[in-house]
Amino acid sequence: MPFVPKKQAFNAHINEVVLGVGDKATAIGGQNVLPFHTFDAEIKNAPKIGVELTDLGMAEYTMPGEKAFYEGCTTVPEMAKRAESLEGASFICLHLEGADPNGLNKSVEECVQLAKDVSDATTLPLVIMGCKNIEKDTELFNKIAEALAGKNILVLSARDENYKTCLLYTSP
């Protein structure tokens, strides 16, 4: 007896969002099926692959392959430029873990400048990931969204406490 798959009902719609600007802009979402359920219906935009970079630089990369790939890079923007050459990379995710008040407690201004420098160094869309401290992330996200207005960045880790103020700068 042949196998006949039963289609899953998914009554919601995942909105399509365009990250970045220019030739390397990439769209995510846009389907009305459960994630990865291509057997139920066509998925408009295939899943994308991002390269995560930390603001802590090369000190955090301990795997031999990572060290070899980023060899010669001395700054995070240089690493972003190198990551752009990875086959299949659709976006850069900048993780600002050095901003954590319980860690290095980098200043908001320093993180904003780094985000600008990374954005200038690469043509790939930029995703910003905070330090997981609600108060610091609120300030970080607002300042970075303001500084990179018009670049269609994605702010990860936004919570109910802080996402609405970021929308002021990211909406067209």
Where are these regions (language model features)?
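Alpha-helix-loop-beta-strand connector modules within alpha/beta enzyme cores
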Residues: K106-L126, L148
